[in-house]
Amino acid sequence: ILKAFPGRTDLSVVVGHDCRNNGRLFAETVANIFSANGIKVYLFESLRPTPEISFAIRQLGAQAGVNVTASHNPKEYNGYKAYWDDGAQVLAPHDHGIIEEVGKVTIDDVKFTPNTDLIEIIGGEMDVDYLMAVKEAMVDQDVINRQKDLNIVYSPLHGTGRVIIPA
């Protein structure tokens, strides 16, 4: 990120996680390393759905984001999904550039002592903004409102959606 945005002093990332093993620990570790290297971090207070991470990146004007999740893989796994400033997962050419930089870094190059002044916890207000944006994106709200017998079933399936829309 530092090399992708040279000369910028206002770099920021959004960091989130899901409900997988050690998700919070890994998200905090990611936040600590970014902050130790001079990058502001918006860290979600608890687990959040992946689309909200993407939304927050754009809403906050962050240059990147990380979601600690293994996505559709078995629950025993965890992973690291990287996002760019458009809120989308990193694609070419950025993915190749990132891997190239990873290959150049040694453990001695990484700063680990967090700068807690650069870590901001986010949550409730972003949830409201996200849910409002989802509602506004509905194709035709009037059609939905006219459905007298409309029933909707929602299940977060024990996932991250349970935080912003409890079942």
Predicted regions and their residues:
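Ferredoxin-reductase
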Residues: 6-85
